[in-house]
């Protein structure tokens, strides 16, 4: 029986690759809902090809453009962030792929869980901001959360069939495009250089986070919530080849790893198939092509990783604040307003001013996000070039 899929963020990197898989497997999937933030032209093309029941454009100023373009089709056209959260509750949706960027994915994910939709989670910030709340909601509503990030998909696969809790998670990181740059060189690293990831094809925001290792810090927090691990039980290993996507170590010293080419369509496909492996003709790993190497991350050159560990150890609303500050920092860097290393300096100053609340609730997270963004914006002028 075919599954009806909702894709939140269908015009982004994960969204377009999800549609690639659906296109090749029309006997398995139908597209029910597509959403985008601003990319009207691509959303229109996607809607005309996949004929969803509903499309939503978050930017309400572009509503009339898509409404006119799809007027000849029986597709409901909605607009606004609240409309995305409403659309995911449609009774006929089976699975929601949460591929929106950043904090914006939080409320739609909550609404989808409350509506008891299966979640294919590509929006790691949802668990960074509100991991305890999300996992409790998922448990209360008996909703499976299937990880789309390659690392968490690898851990999920390595844990299948295991009856005992793992001793440690070994979370691998490519190291990004700046792995071997000196501290001096990092100060002059450009946006264009940061966006040239050596292994992965990803969106701009996550690519910058990968370059700063903030992405790995957020993935550590995501792993903590998904797999019920403590931060000290998660080790980060730099693995430049991105062939081993992560590993799990058990109390007898055994280690299980999941390997594959660095292609996001693999973990997306695994999540869509709900652990059923969908055949494909993608390239296979050539184990003779290159050695597999590992090294420890340099926390002096890449302090964002330390900030993530600090935030999750503090708990409460600290990870939410870190995420908000990081979104402001990355946006400023992408606009060439601050330097690469100033992103970390901005995060440090924001977190020094952060007011910690232990309460875990949606109103707390909403207030923390808003307040932290305001603080980060107020500090930006001292870093602007």
Curated annotation (Swiss-Prot):
Transmembrane segments: none
Recorded GO MF terms: 1-deoxy-D-xylulose-5-phosphate reductoisomerase activity; manganese ion binding; NADPH binding
Binding site for 1-deoxy-D-xylulose 5-phosphate: 124, 150-151, 174, 197, 210, 215-216, 219
Binding positions (NADPH): 11-14, 39, 123, 125, 203
Pfam families cross-referenced by the UniProt entry: DXP_redisom_C (PF08436), DXP_reductoisom (PF02670), DXPR_C (PF13288)
Residues given in the record as Mn(2+) binding sites: 149, 151, 219
Family: Belongs to the DXR family.
Purpose of the protein: Catalyzes the NADPH-dependent rearrangement and reduction of 1-deoxy-D-xylulose-5-phosphate (DXP) to 2-C-methyl-D-erythritol 4-phosphate (MEP).
Record's protein name: 1-deoxy-D-xylulose 5-phosphate reductoisomerase
Lineage: Bacteria, Pseudomonadati, Bacteroidota, Bacteroidia, Bacteroidales
Name of encoding gene: dxr
